[in-house]
Amino acid sequence: MNSLDAFAAAKLADLEERGLRRTLRENWREDGLWISVDGQKLLSFSCNDYLNLTHHPALKAAAIRAIETYGVGAGASRLVTGNHPLLEKLEARLAALKGSEAACIFGAGYLANTGIIPTLVGKDDLILIDELAHACLFAGTQLSPATVRIFRHNDIAEVESLLATNRAHYRHALLLTDGVFSMDGDLAPLPALAEICTHHDCWLMADDAHGLGVIGQGRGSRHAFDPAPVIPLQMGTLSKAIGGYGGYLCASKPVIDLMKTRARTVVYSTGLPPALAASALAALDLIESDSDLVKKPLANARLFTTRLGLSPAQSPIVPIILGTVEAVMSAAQTLFTQGFLVTPIRPPTVPEGTARLRFAFTAGHAAEDILHLADVVAPLMPAKAR
């Protein structure tokens, strides 16, 4: 065995011993709710397709029309020949929905964050980031030479202290947070963060991947508050409630113009395929016209938390923290045998000691299935959580 294979094998053996090795299981979703895994048909509570739009006829028809008219791929970077008119139309729609001046489409949410952050801050700058922020926000900080300070989850007092102590020593400051936290389902205290950031001349960026389409009348986490706070940098993805693929940033026109000329993940990545832009536009049509659809995922999550006697869900994401890897793997297998797919979440995705079942509720889940799920989950929960 050569040194490369030996290295990989040793890493895999260590992960296997700690119950942290991950493997891909072939699966396919039939209709946005039901999924076939290893030949077994399961009701999924793991998918981020919150509005069940991946199989919606309007999205499929829009994508098919775009493929037949424009082809499958963009063919080049947006700065070369990949800037299809549908992308600019989508940017205008997203900016209007999010209440910003302009928008920039990226190839994926991960590409957005790893492009935006190093474009904005560098050697003489400061980044503050929530300890539970998504991995791609942390990845973006690693691509910048800026000084990074991590603050305790949603801890306003620590943010205030860090900025009061450090802000004067840096040229610019950027605060990074999720709008809706992907593993905990709670919302960031955006009004308080916005006020502190304004006071200290710190730029606030919210990753709203799990907010668009399901929170704040579909406009995202900023609009969950009244009045909506000013968030100068609103990032998100097109792969969750939108049902497709891609990422975006909504911001002022000067910021967006800077992204389109300097963000490396725009400049050096092929543009988003026209079909994905077309399906995203169809999704926005539905989000803007069907308020009942938008409300349903959160209502379903709250039906689940009410049945279990938990605090009301703040988003379609509900975690049940079991602690150990062994406990969460066993619980996931129990749910599997009962016909439910609920993916166990283990470190390093979540901190050590907080392995959990992560439930994602969609518009299509039926009340009777949610109540049945809750009844199966109840005996699996730690006593202190009941």
Curated annotation (Swiss-Prot):
Residues that bind pyridoxal 5'-phosphate: G109, Y110, S182, D207, D208, A209, H210, T237, L238, S239, K240
Uppermost EC category: transferase
Cofactors: pyridoxal 5'-phosphate
Alphabetical GO biological process terms: biotin biosynthetic process
Molecular function terms from GO: 8-amino-7-oxononanoate synthase activity; pyridoxal phosphate binding
Residues that bind substrate: R22, R29, H134, T349
Assigned EC number: 2.3.1.47
Gene3D superfamilies to which the protein is assigned, alphabetical: Aspartate Aminotransferase, domain 1, Type I PLP-dependent aspartate aminotransferase-like (Major domain)
Keyword DNA-binding attributed: no
Source organism, top-level taxon: Bacteria
Reactions mediated catalytically: 6-carboxyhexanoyl-[ACP] + L-alanine + H(+) = (8S)-8-amino-7-oxononanoate + holo-[ACP] + CO2
Pathway: Cofactor biosynthesis; biotin biosynthesis
SUPFAM superfamilies per record: PLP-dependent transferases
Sorted UniProt keywords: Acyltransferase, Biotin biosynthesis, Pyridoxal phosphate, Transferase
Modified residues (N6-(pyridoxal phosphate)lysine): K240
Subunit composition and interactions: Homodimer.
Family of the protein in this entry: Belongs to the class-II pyridoxal-phosphate-dependent aminotransferase family. BioF subfamily.
Biological role: Catalyzes the decarboxylative condensation of pimeloyl-[acyl-carrier protein] and L-alanine to produce 8-amino-7-oxononanoate (AON), [acyl-carrier protein], and carbon dioxide.
The protein's name: 8-amino-7-oxononanoate synthase
